[in-house]
């Protein structure tokens, strides 16, 4: 799934537009591999497995001594990470944007919402639904962060800054899917049962970010991923405004603001890792870039379309909600913010990773040009989320 980041699908899901090292790098001290099941097991269709095969999975690739890096950063995290959380009493809640069911004017408010939604085209709804489903798979994302060695919430109520951040971040994110879900439900424009099935399939399938229980890789992944969601929700806000639904624009804009705040926090973690362990951190950035940042919803399935995520991504690309150019811009922003080009004292492997990362954005922009050329010949496919209507990719 090359360059598939919540809206970009420049190749099939079979992998990368960029070279990918076939062997593990020398930096890996201890790692185990979860192999594919045997032919006998693999040939049997299982009810609760991803719609397609995930990669051979590497686990616990971070050398054990590196855990000390994250132990030593606990005070830093308490002072520099937790400040990017908002107190619950100061956070917006979904009810702030929705018709009040306890109000005498509830029915009229719902009618007004539905009238506004009549002006919104079906392809926009496809993208908004895809974004909502991605947000609703939040249990998977908290699970992913809690796979990371050295920072996981060991008990479910651990009081380290890392664990506090993960729980509170999850609590803030939980409002996003709730709000979009309720808005779409009230709109009357979508097939909620198909959407709900897609959410259940997605959470059941999990995700395959290839972060290897390694917090270096995990925080690089989340930094870039949060940049993507900020851009995506920001663009859905812009389009909602163009379609005349100012309330929906406000909803998407408020979610985008949260995502930007979270992006800043995760970006600061990688920035700090580059300060205390520049070689280890730049190798992690290079590793994730070579693998390609797969989006959390890349195993999306509705019971019908085996390529649902690719189709949703293609619509998002066509509408300008999230494109390869956006990915290049996000990557360029982070590489500049992290001052990767200025790193010195790196190992030979670190310098190769540095060169690769710094030269990646221009290569992605060339791929964007090819994608635009292919888009002129795009087909149309049905989306169960909008009652099987066909949408151009």
UniProtKB/Swiss-Prot annotation:
Instruction: Identify the residues that bind Fe cation 1.
Output: 135, 173, 176, 259
Subcellular location, record wording: Plastid, Chloroplast; Plastid
> What residue stretch is labeled transit peptide in the record?
1-30
Q: Which GO terms describe its molecular function?
A: metal ion binding; stearoyl-[ACP] desaturase activity
Instruction: Identify which cofactors the protein needs according to its UniProt entry.
Output: Fe(2+)
What does the record give as EC number? 1.14.19.2
Catalytic reaction equation(s): octadecanoyl-[ACP] + 2 reduced [2Fe-2S]-[ferredoxin] + O2 + 2 H(+) = (9Z)-octadecenoyl-[ACP] + 2 oxidized [2Fe-2S]-[ferredoxin] + 2 H2O
Q: What CDD domains does the database record attribute to this sequence?
A: Acyl_ACP_Desat (cd01050)
Oxidoreductase as UniProt keyword: yes
**Which EC class is this protein assigned?**
oxidoreductase
The entry's free-text remark on the cofactor is:
Binds 2 Fe(2+) ions per subunit.
Gene3D superfamilies per the record? Ribonucleotide Reductase, subunit A (1.10.620.20)
Q: Which UniProt keywords apply?
A: Chloroplast, Fatty acid biosynthesis, Fatty acid metabolism, Iron, Lipid biosynthesis, Lipid metabolism, Metal-binding, Oxidoreductase, Plastid, Transit peptide
Which GO cellular component terms, listed alphabetically, does the Swiss-Prot or TrEMBL entry include?
chloroplast
The UniProt entry's sequence similarity note says: Belongs to the fatty acid desaturase type 2 family.
Q: What is annotated about its quaternary structure and interactions?
A: Homodimer.
Name of the protein described by the UniProt record: Stearoyl-[acyl-carrier-protein] 9-desaturase, chloroplastic
Give the species: Solanum tuberosum
Question: Source organism lineage?
Answer: Eukaryota, Viridiplantae, Streptophyta, Embryophyta, Tracheophyta
